[in-house]
Amino acid sequence: MSFPISKVISAGLIFLVFFSCKTSPVQQEETVSAVPKDTVYYDTVIGPPEPPPAPIVYSVDTFLNDYASLVSGLPADKYFGHFYLDSSYMRLERRSGREWNYMMENKINNMRAWSDTVVAPSSEAKALFYPFAGADFLHVDPLFHNVNRYVMVGLEPLGTVIADTGNKRVLKSHADKIYRSLYFSNRLGFFRTLSMRAELNQKELNGALPLLLFYIRRFGYSISSLEYFDLDSTGNVLQSDPASAIGLKIKFHDFKGPIRELDYFRFDLSDDGLQRDDRLIRYVSKMEPYGVYLKAASYLMHNSSFSSIRGTILNKALFVLQDDSGIPLSSFEEGAWERQLWGKYTRTISLFRGRYQSSLASAYKQGPSLPLNFYIGYNISHKECNMMWFRKSISINTTQSNNQGANQS
């Protein structure tokens, strides 16, 4: 008996489908019967893959990078070989190395691990705003290494690269002054405003730049560029020379990740200062969604004379990470912010005893508060440090994003 060739082919296809599927007989029957006899199968057509992102071009300013190595006690033989092999510099190099290793083992590594579980997973911020920072990049990198842009503000001058780089005596004095100015700050966990102001107003150490370069280089980054700039009345950047600049920008990288930017401003953030000149606030308002870090801030935002910067932070920041010297607990509207406490809080140092917050002590007592495995801030002297993480509630964030979109449309 003969069969039409089409039926033979159909039967063969059904046979192959039947034995190639690892399903139950019922499923097999349903699968076969669900396919119309006239169904035609096509391979899914996939378009060409999207091209990979353009590779990052990592440039290095070899002189600036060598200078950063010199001030941080690292090999600097490209431009400073005449001093790098000098016995006095080699002693400084050993001291700086021992001090940095101590900081890494006793503080920085713990901070970085803490940040990986607390800060990095909890915020979409692309930038960090650090008022009252001075040159404190020591705490910025380990706590916010997931952020690529940093805006730091202090009262210390911007500073420049030392002019007389060919003079061994001047270089030694310059490097020694940097080491001494940072030694106590590194151990204490904060900059002493009055002493730092005096130390950074000298001929051989005239501002924050060398200290920032010290930290950037010690954290393993290479320096791409340094620019000085001014701001127009709307907060847009204008080119400037160091003498008249309002800020400086350092670009740096580690040859692996993104190119990072650090802006340092010398600016008065008091209400009087911002009333005279609000360009910095306008500049910050143009930033990507940002978080805020506050540490050893002299309790300035507890005063009515710093209400403007306090209000800006509370209105615009996605998160605030701070110790008790930042914004008072009572300023964070309940329900608008998620809160987590770390460490311990029962008192302030005697210099700021008038800034004790009974509401904060009650919050710590009621809990929950989690242990903090590193020392930071004013209370480091009696080993009672605290950190507070405030994250704007999702509903508040969504409302602000919608409002920003409406304003931009």
Range-by-range predicted roles:
Residues 1-9:
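Bacterial N-terminal signal peptides that target proteins for export
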Residues 133-145, 151-155, 188-213:
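Short, thiol/selenol-centered motifs that function as redox-active sites or metal-ligating centers
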Residues 217-282:
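Active-site/pore-lining binding-face segments in mid-to-C-terminal subdomains
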